[in-house]
Swiss-Prot record:
It comes from Acorus calamus. F-type ATPases have 2 components, CF(1) - the catalytic core - and CF(0) - the membrane proton channel. CF(1) has five subunits: alpha(3), beta(3), gamma(1), delta(1), epsilon(1). CF(0) has four main subunits: a(1), b(1), b'(1) and c(9-12). The lineage of its organism: Eukaryota, Viridiplantae, Streptophyta, Embryophyta, Tracheophyta. It is a peripheral membrane protein. This is ATP synthase subunit beta, chloroplastic. Produces ATP from ADP in the presence of a proton gradient across the membrane. The catalytic sites are hosted primarily by the beta subunits. Its main location: plastid. It catalyses: ATP + H2O + 4 H(+)(in) = ADP + phosphate + 5 H(+)(out). Pfam families: ATP-synt_ab, ATP-synt_ab_N, ATP-synt_VA_C. It is found in: Plastid, Chloroplast thylakoid membrane. It comes from the Eukaryota. Belongs to the ATPase alpha/beta chains family. PROSITE patterns: ATPASE_ALPHA_BETA.
């Protein structure tokens, strides 16, 4: 569906002309507002409360209409703290849904749920805005062609490839390299696909959001000198904010991504960290809105809310939005309604392993736990599929043999198993890769490896042609030619030492 962005100042009347209501009840982040007969606002309309609190401080709170209660009353959820609001305060109906700035002006900047910049870098051009509520693209506008979204990261492209316009779940604890992987994907989509990224921080820690921003500036993903040359827009609704903001910040980020897809006709990466917090925020306000709780206390509208967000993330004939969503699994229970509802929408899962991170293998993507619906011969081709399956079989066999190796040692294995272990260790190391965004920390230049190069490299390892090379030659290199060159260098170095 093509976006028709609104231009401020033309169609939207000023706040002074709007119809006025009054607050009749406040319960936490939820307000009831009475309007004159026949002047009821529509659902999802933005309401603005302006005034002064008892201490004389100015108040400016934006709310969103959620329910029409009858008796000329509406129930709305506040997007910021309701401290200082009192019954009888004037409420202005803006006559439209929340609208946020879109387009190139958003790149390199940090926004809140209302599309206001929060990075102290001055105002943003708001001439082009877009409402955060929109229906998903019509079926006829969708691009149904199955195509792989090449990331340039070997382990992802070979074993759990991403679908162009698909949704990927990113599972990983703290300190296993989620942020670095996210930044590398942002960097690679900009270089290889000429695309941009939008990062939606949904209910995440303020510290993490700040760290991500600082690391993006360090690695050049955000260009401080020429802000318009940045590759990412950031939208944050942090943990300390009311549930209304956390519930809608994902839609704000998605609206910015949709503009890049539909108007600029670009490939867009949309990161949502964390999709569970989106559900959690909805469940927090659900009871206050008078809804009966569903399973495990979640909102009864869980599937609908998730669907309305996820169905807008798709490929159209203009461009694509590929979404990578960090998924928190409460108490590691995959049957919990929140992650279970999310899984229904995912095309691929990328699982980060603490064990691999401890070994120093980065990206620490678990090659056996990560999955993708794209890894089928009819989509990726017979050669890619066969190579991926053989890599997985070799790694699986190595995993099965590890207990025997730990107890009895390598010497007790059969000749065939020893060969499998040697190749598996080479594969494990070859799945590591130096990242562009980590150059500033590691000093080794980043590598983008095309899919054909990746497949060729693993085929050579599996065929046994490279059995004579030391396994450290495969660690943190790009393609297989670099591994053979590194092996020669290691040989020269060892001779010089002698």
């Amino acid at each position: 569906m093509r976006i028709t962005p609104t231009t401020s100042g033309s169609a939207v009347p000023s706040l002074d002309e709007k119809n006025l209501g009054r607050i009749v009840q406040i319960i936490g982040p939820v307000l009831d507002v009475a309007f004159p007969p026949g002047k009821m606002p529509n659902i999802y309309n933005a309401l603005v409360v302006k005034g002064r609190d008892t201490a004389g401080q100015p108040i400016n709170v934006t709310c969103e209409v959620q329910q029409l209660l009858g008796n000329n009353r509406v129930r709305a959820v506040a997007m910021s703290a309701t401290d200082g609001l009192t019954r009888g305060m004037e409420v202005i109906d803006t006559g439209a849904a929340l609208s946020v700035p879109v387009g190139g002006a958003t790149l390199g900047r940090i926004f809140n749920v209302l599309g206001e910049p929060v990075d102290n870098l001055g105002p943003v051009d708001t001439r082009t805005t877009s409402p955060i509520h929109r229906s998903a693209p019509a079926f006829i506008q969708l691009d149904t062609k199955l195509s792989i979204f090449e990331t340039g990261i070997k382990v992802v492209d070979l074993l759990a490839p991403y679908r162009r316009g698909g949704k990927i779940g990113l599972f990983g604890g703290a300190g296993v390299g989620k942020t670095v992987l996210i930044m590398e994907l942002i960097n690679n989509i900009a270089k290889a696909h000429g695309g941009v990224s939008v990062f939606g921080g949904v209910g995440e820690r303020t510290r993490e959001g700040n760290d991500l921003y600082m690391e993006m500036k360090e690695s050049g993903v955000i260009n401080e000198e020429k802000i318009e040359e940045s590759k990412v827009a950031l939208v944050y609704g942090q943990m300390n904010e009311p549930p209304g903001a956390r519930m809608r910040v994902g839609l704000t980020a998605l609206t910015m991504a949709e503009y890049f897809r539909d108007v600029n006709e670009q490939d867009v990466l949309l990161f949502i960290d964390n999709i569970f917090r989106f559900v959690q925020a909805g469940s927090e306000v659900s009871a206050l809105l008078g809804r009966m709780p569903s399973a495990v206390g979640y909102q009864p509208t869980l599937s609908t809310e998730m669907g309305s967000l996820q169905e807008r993330i798709t490929s159209t004939k203009e461009g694509s939005i590929t979404s990578i969503q960090a998924v928190y699994v409460p108490a590691d229970d995959l049957t919990d309604p929140a992650p279970a509802t999310t899984f229904a929408h995912l095309d691929a899962t990328t699982v980060l392993s603490r064990g691999l991170a401890a070994k120093g293998i980065y990206p620490a993507v678990d090659p056996l736990d990560s999955t993708s619906t794209m890894l089928q011969p009819r989509i990726v081709g017979e050669e890619h599929y066969e190579t991926a399956q053989r890599v997985k079989q070799t790694l699986q066999r190595y995993k099965e043999l590890q207990d025997i190796i730990a107890i009895l040692g390598l010497d007790e294995l059969s000749e065939e198993d020893r060969l499998t272990v040697a190749r598996a260790r080479k594969i494990e190391r070859f799945l590591s890769q130096p990242f562009f965004v980590a150059e500033v920390f590691t000093g080794s230049p980043g590598k983008y490896v095309g899919l054909a190069e990746t497949i060729r490299g693993f085929q050579l390892i599996l065929s046994g042609e490279l059995d004579g090379l030391p396994e450290q030659a495969f660690y943190l290199v790009g393609n297989i030619d670099e591994a053979t060159a590194k092996a020669m260098n290691l040989e020269v170095e060892s001779k010089l030492k002698k």
